[in-house]
Amino acid sequence: EVRKMRNIKIDFNKSLKKVLLAYAVIFLAGIAFIFIPGFGVKLDINFGGGTKIAYSYTGDVKDADIEDTVKGVLDKSFTVSKSTSLAGDTKTFEIALVGKNSVSAEKQEELTKALTEKFSDNTIELYNSNSVSPTVAGSFFTKSIVAVLITALFVIIYVGIRFRRIGGISAAVTALCALVFDVFITFFTCVFFKLQLDSNYIAVVLTILGYSLNDTIVVYDRVRENERLMPDSEISDVVNVSINTSLKRNAITSLTTFVAVMTIVAVSELFGLSTLRTFAVPMAFGIVSGAVSSGEGIKSTISSM
């Protein structure tokens, strides 16, 4: 016990209130950004329905010229984004209309003709086109939420059974609360960076749930072991020692993963790959949140048992 107590480097008892206050500030700031003009929740056509039309081109085309041409054909709200293939041999721009702003086949042909005439020197060609009805999008969104809820249910069952010695259901609820906060962090990241919520976001959420839960279980294992080795110690001291002894392992794992994800972010920004960006950016923030919440979330609940 004496040897383990010497391993304490950070007193999480003192930092708990500050961390919880920081959580509250981040949460309120995230909620506020939802209602700030220009930010808000932006749904991809997979969740909100609509149409995406992509064109390949050569040379350089200005966003303003694309927007002016599209406005001359479509009297609907839209966004334009550019991307370049990793090999650098294919440039595309995508016109997205979300919600009920779908585009008929006739209008797509008219738009293609207008763009071809406007950028006659840029070899404009239709790259791909995709439309999703609001009904289908709503069904996909519902199924995605159900998948996340089922995952949360299995988390409660698994953690509750495996760690019944250190709280059982209380331990499971603690882990779930930490996971919920991590999900909110990824959501607020999308709002702040004006990223569309698409199928990539669901992949991020499910990945973060598994990643953060793994960190939490590592600490729980330490708590269970140290509770047996330190029978005369207060539970707060046991938890404090457990977090510190697993801190190096979790920090190295999180840092390694974070660097890898930030590499993906850099590539997505360099080549304008929006699909990679909507995955990597919230993933990076989710990793940081998961590393913090796996320790402080456990501390906040187990210490009060």
Q: What are the residue ranges of the model-derived segments?
A:
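A structural signal for conserved, well-ordered secondary-structure elements
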Residues: 1-305
